[in-house]
Amino acid sequence: GTAFSGLSGTYFFCQARFGSDSHTTQWNFGQRPFAYTAPSGFKALCTQNLPTPTIGATSATRANKYFDVVLRTSNGNVGGTYSTTVNMSNGALLWDKGRSINSSHYLLDSVRGISKTLSSDTTGAEANYPNWFTNFGSSSFTTGSDDYTAGTTVVDWIWAANGSGSTNNAGSIQSTVSASTLSGFSIVTYTGNATAGATVGHGLGVTPSMFIIKSRSLATGWPVYHVNSNASPATGYLSLQVSFHSF
């Protein structure tokens, strides 16, 4: 018979037993014949009956084509070239952090130009380091003479975008956007107009669940919007540069 009806939301399967004795549980999601006939209109919960995923459906859309983590050791002012699974020549954002030293977090991208950095742990305005990251390639990135001291271990998080940026007029403020609609990630730059209710196009084609904002020209914070941050996410934002929430 029907155990439940009218349920909504996300489902998680679990099994629990009370007591100190041990039990073995076997789950049958369709890998074996069912003991009873499934109700009309229902299918086994298995990969074959799930929708084809947008990410990972083919070798060209594997998740590591859109996001990668690179662990590297700096060669100092000699610079170096480091491999990645992301085609950074087609637009990317790189988030850099020294692991073996106390350093800031540095963000750079293809839209602003890879010599321009912002630090997520400070309120500082954009800085320019023309000899730090010198190239975003199709399967690697290159550092120059402004890289960390030789021997420093570093982590770089990399997100794929889509090009060096194109004009977007979807909002009341014109923006420059590099958007990967398949992976749901975009880089957006714009010039604010100090007008309440102004809108900015992001190029994704769907409502984003999260975004991070930082002024490039002013020493300001890093407000972070997330759809599930609290009951009023538009005003209940987080700030990257501090260790407490800003609800």
Question: Where does each model-flagged region fall?
Answer:
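Surface-exposed molecular-recognition determinants
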Residues: 2-247
